[in-house]
UniProtKB/Swiss-Prot annotation:
Domain of life the protein comes from: Bacteria
Annotated gene: uppS
Keyword annotations of the record: Magnesium, Metal-binding, Transferase
Family in the record: Belongs to the UPP synthase family.
This protein's name: Isoprenyl transferase
Subunit structure: Homodimer.
GO biological process entries: polyprenol biosynthetic process
HAMAP family (alphabetical): ISPT
Cofactor(s) required, per the database record: Mg(2+)
Cofactor note: Binds 2 magnesium ions per subunit.
Amino acid sequence: MDNTLKHLAIIMDGNGRWAKLKNKARAYGHKKGVKTLKDITIWCANHKLECLTLYAFSTENWKRPKSEVDFLMKMLKKYLKDERSTYLNNNIRFRAIGDLEGFSKELRDTILQLENDTRHFKDFTQVLALNYGSKNELSRAFKSLLESPPSHINLLESLENEISNRLDTHDLPEVDLLLRTGGEMRLSNFLLWQSSYAELFFTPILWPDFTPKDLENIISDFYKRVRKFGELKC
């Protein structure tokens, strides 16, 4: 199998702790985190990656205080509108994954509009995981499979493909490298199916402090690793 880094996935963790260290409100950390998101996205677009998936809002994030959730929704809508030119000028295709029905119609329309405006770009895709959780995604895939089962008899042999084709990421490559900032060492229900053979990297750097140079160093480490994909390699 190909060892080239095509799909990078990032759990952007540490905005709140970063703001606390600065004696600022959590919203301040989220705003700085958006700038990091933009910088990392443009770097990836310019360095021949095929796909960057960013964990922006999880199905569990609704449990946060309503004031913070409301702020995040407003910030997301503003980002998608304000950065439209960034996507167009850098030939970036935008995709959203997750249970978008959980959002307001206005926000869903904003998401769909940017997807539509950038759908013709082929070289690089930025994916925002929004109201996303792997358990939710797999549940929706299984529900789809039960509601419209394939007609062929040999289901067990093709079950993996049937599930993959019903995931939000059906048109994207498998994850090669999954990175989490902020020091925590868990996957937090993120791309569990798609990361079955991904290399994992955990850095203590808080997301607002994370730079393209930090990413370069991590990618350099990625290419030093031997990816076996279950095979024996000497």
